[in-house]
Each structure stands twice: as structure tokens, then as C-alpha cells.
């Protein structure tokens, strides 16, 4: 008896997920494999990918355009949370996994499949993100992960595929492992496994080298409504267009590269290179607008929530009770995070140089040091006395021994 009757396979068109098709059928006795390729803005032509799955033995090959849903329902909430794993990684890849898992589960329901499958290995974070998300959405659905069990090298995987008519890659395989979507790119493996080695320029695609960036700065005004990006330079834009345009404009000036040692969920450290020009600028701009519109106590408390939120998403707990609770808090804080942030792009930098909001809590007459100052300086003495009282009591007791 096979491990499943009918399987929905998350499909990218690469060697591993292509080999999963005959492997599931011939090694694990799956009677029917239906592939699902999800368009998240990775730039691949999806019709050739769909045909490739059919040629590899899939009984049906599905394609889902999920770009708008990806940005609106996954990226924008993460921007509202200022989500940066370990204060650096904006979760560009991690955010895609719960959406793909959701679409897999929906396809399984629609086509009556008793299992879903993915091509993740046993070493990365994505296997956790897929398996846990699928379990949260449908705990009765089996999850199959052939690449986690088959134990084949890259060469053996290619040879196995050739037995079933899956052609070997035409060009020499890149030494890098690359994942891409509309939010950015992640690059790892190959020469990058040496943490001392500077990445070659060939690894980058979305961001220009500094020496090739414009010699004049560019300004972009980003409009937000309730914490959600809605416009560039006063032009209302749909989510996909907004992120796409910002990627191009920011990347042209060389901003958006991350080179970090990252703590994976499975317990190992890995060297990761990321490109996320638009996403990083949106997070920076959003955080700055919050500094203008949130009270100090809410803003400071939210920073701790953001760290927990980022860790949950990175660790595959998008669909979890704690994540839902954090979502509720974050949404409450965003009601007045509305306004415009001006960002200056120049030679690998993206700096906020202006911000305005109809809900601004900044009061010039209180902040100024000029003649129009309305702050009551006489009130400071009493405040300082009360504020410093615990410290004075502590110091007195310390002197008394």
C-alpha cells in the first residue's frame, strides 16, 4: 500500500521537485500526483513550468497567481509589525511559506487529495514552516517530504530524474542556492559557506554595486494608511505595483543588501545573503512614521512584540494562537499610523529625511527652543525630584551600609 492515494505537490520546476513526481509514484506508491506552482513574483514563466510537471508524470499541473494576496495579506502585516528576524532579516522568504501551505491545503480539499508534499530537505527552516502550517490548517492531511528521506546527492538526483525523462539542467549548476519572490532574494551555499569570504558581485541581482549607482540622490515619498503602504510620490498604487516599483528604484541606488550569520530553527548557524530593497525601505519608513504617531509607551512596548512576532514567523508559526494575539495588538496600534514619509536614496543608503501625518503627536511649540517655546520649564524641577526619588533613597541606604 502506498503512502497516499492522491498528492498535491508544491512545485517549482527545479530538479528536486521534478524528481519528486516519479519518486512519489514509483518509490512510495502514490497513484496520482498533482503539482501546484505558485506565482509570488519570482519572475519565472509559469506555462513552461506547468508543462514540465506534466512531462515528468504529473496527472495535472496547477498554477496559482498569488502575488496580490502575498503582498496584501502577508507582507503588509509584517511591515506593520516592523518584522526583522534578529534585527536584520525582513522575512522575505519566510513570509511566502504559510501562503504556499494555505494554497496546498485548499487544493487538497478541492481535488480530494489525502496528502500534500514538498521538496524541502531535512536541514533547512522551510520544512518546518510547511509542515507546521499545513498541520495548523488541516491536521488530518498527510505531509510527504521525499527529499528529506531519499538520501540522494545532487548528481544522483539528476540521474534518477533522467531515468524518467526529466532532463538534466542545460547549463552548469550554480554553486548557490537561491530563492526569489516579489519581496526579495535569499542566496546561500557554495563559496558563501565561508563566513570570511566577501560575496562576489555575481550573487546580487536586485541591487546595484555602489560604483554603478547614480551620482545624484533620488527622493521617494511613501504614503501610509493605517500602517499599510498605499502610494509612492502621491500616486495611489496597488500592492504589487507599489512593491515592484520600489524594488527597482531602491535597488538602482544599491540599498537592500544583507550579509549575516543567521540562527536557524533546526539549531545550526548559516551564512545568508539577502536582497530586499523595497521591503527594507518600507519597514524603515513605517517605523519612522510610528515614532511620529504612537505614544511613547505604546511604541516602546510594541518593539518587544515585534521581536516575538518576527521569531514566530521565522519559526513557522504564522498560524498559531500567539501569532493571532500579536496580530490583534498590532492592528490596534496601527489605526493612526497614517501619513507620508520621505526617503532619500543615494549610494547604498536609504535615509528617512522627512515625515508628516494628520495624527502627528509632535508639537513644535513644545519642542522648540525658540521664543515661541510653550513648555513650562518650572515644572521640570518637581518632576525631576519625584522621578529621581527611588535613586536617592537607594543611594542613601547604600551610604548607610
Curated annotation (Swiss-Prot):
A GO molecular-function descriptor: argininosuccinate synthase activity
Q: Where in the cell is it found?
A: Cytoplasm
List keywords of the entry alphabetically. Amino-acid biosynthesis, Arginine biosynthesis, ATP-binding, Cytoplasm, Ligase, Nucleotide-binding
User: Is-annotated flag, keyword Cell cycle?
Assistant: no
Residues noted as binding L-citrulline in the record, renumbered to the chain:
89, 125, 129, 177, 186, 262, 274
InterPro entries registered for this protein in UniProt: Arginosuc_syn_C, Arginosuc_syn_N, Arginosuc_synth, Arginosuc_synth_CS, Arginosuc_synth_type_1_subfam, AS_cat/multimer_dom_body, Rossmann-like_a/b/a_fold
Q: Does the keyword DNA damage apply?
A: no
- Give the matching Gene3D superfamilies: Argininosuccinate synthetase, chain A, domain 2, HUPs, Single helix bin
Name the GO cellular-component terms: cytoplasm
**Annotated pathway:** Amino-acid biosynthesis; L-arginine biosynthesis; L-arginine from L-ornithine and carbamoyl phosphate: step 2/3
SUPFAM superfamilies per the UniProt record, alphabetical: Adenine nucleotide alpha hydrolases-like, Argininosuccinate synthetase, C-terminal domain
Binding residue positions for ATP: 10-18, 119
PANTHER family with a match to the protein in the record? ARGININOSUCCINATE SYNTHASE
Q: Which family does it belong to?
A: Belongs to the argininosuccinate synthase family. Type 1 subfamily.
The protein, known as: Argininosuccinate synthase
Write the lineage as a comma-separated list. Bacteria, Bacillati, Cyanobacteriota, Cyanophyceae, Acaryochloridales
Amino acid at each position: 500500500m502506498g503512502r497516499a492515494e492522491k498528492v498535491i505537490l508544491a512545485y517549482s520546476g527545479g530538479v528536486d521537485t521534478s524528481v519528486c513526481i516519479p519518486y512519489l509514484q514509483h518509490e512510495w506508491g502514490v497513484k496520482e500526483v498533482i503539482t501546484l506552482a505558485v506565482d509570488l513574483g519570482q519572475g519565472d514563466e509559469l506555462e513552461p513550468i506547468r508543462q514540465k510537471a506534466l512531462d515528468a508524470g504529473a496527472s495535472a499541473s496547477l498554477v496559482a497567481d498569488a502575488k496580490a494576496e502575498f503582498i496584501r495579506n502577508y507582507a503588509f502585516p509584517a511591515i506593520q509589525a516592523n518584522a526583522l528576524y534578529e534585527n536584520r532579516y525582513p522575512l522575505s522568504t519566510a513570509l511566502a511559506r504559510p501562503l504556499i501551505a494555505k494554497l496546498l491545503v485548499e487544493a487538497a480539499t478541492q481535488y480530494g487529495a489525502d496528502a500534500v508534499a514538498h521538496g524541502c530537505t531535512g536541514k533547512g527552516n522551510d520544512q518546518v514552516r510547511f509542515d507546521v502550517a499545513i498541520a495548523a490548517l488541516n491536521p488530518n492531511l498527510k505531509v510527504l517530504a521525499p527529499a528529506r528521506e531519499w538520501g540522494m546527492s545532487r548528481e544522483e538526483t539528476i540521474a534518477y530524474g533522467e531515468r524518467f525523462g526529466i532532463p538534466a539542467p542545460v547549463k552548469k549548476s550554480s554553486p548557490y542556492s537561491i530563492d526569489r519572490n516579489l519581496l526579495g532574494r535569499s542566496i546561500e551555499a557554495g563559496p558563501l559557506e565561508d563566513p570570511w569570504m566577501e560575496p562576489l558581485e555575481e550573487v546580487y541581482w536586485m541591487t546595484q554595486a555602489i560604483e554603478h549607482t547614480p551620482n545624484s540622490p533620488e527622493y521617494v515619498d511613501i504614503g501610509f494608511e493605517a500602517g499599510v503602504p498605499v502610494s509612492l510620490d502621491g500616486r495611489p498604487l496597488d500592492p504589487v505595483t507599489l512593491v515592484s516599483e520600489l524594488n527597482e528604484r531602491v535597488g538602482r541606488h544599491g540599498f537592500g543588501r544583507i550579509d549575516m550569520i543567521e540562527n536557524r530553527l533546526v539549531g545550526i548557524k548559516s551564512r545568508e545573503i539577502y536582497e530586499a530593497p523595497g521591503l527594507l525601505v518600507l519597514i524603515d519608513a513605517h517605523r519612522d512614521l510610528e515614532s511620529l504617531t504612537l505614544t511613547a509607551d505604546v511604541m516602546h512596548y510594541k518593539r518587544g512584540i515585534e521581536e516575538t512576532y518576527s521569531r514566530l514567523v521565522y519559526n513557522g508559526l504564522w498560524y498559531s494562537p500567539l501569532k493571532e494575539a500579536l496580530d490583534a495588538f498590532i492592528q490596534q496600534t496601527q489605526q493612526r499610523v497614517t501619513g507620508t514619509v520621505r526617503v532619500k536614496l543615494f549610494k547604498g543608503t536609504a535615509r528617512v529625511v522627512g515625515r508628516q501625518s494628520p495624527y502627528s503627536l509632535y508639537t513644535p511649540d513644545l519642542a522648540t527652543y525658540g521664543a515661541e517655546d510653550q513648555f513650562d520649564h518650572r515644572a521640570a524641577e518637581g518632576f525631576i525630584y519625584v522621578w529621581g526619588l527611588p535613586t536617592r533613597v537607594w543611594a542613601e541606604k547604600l551610604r548607610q551600609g
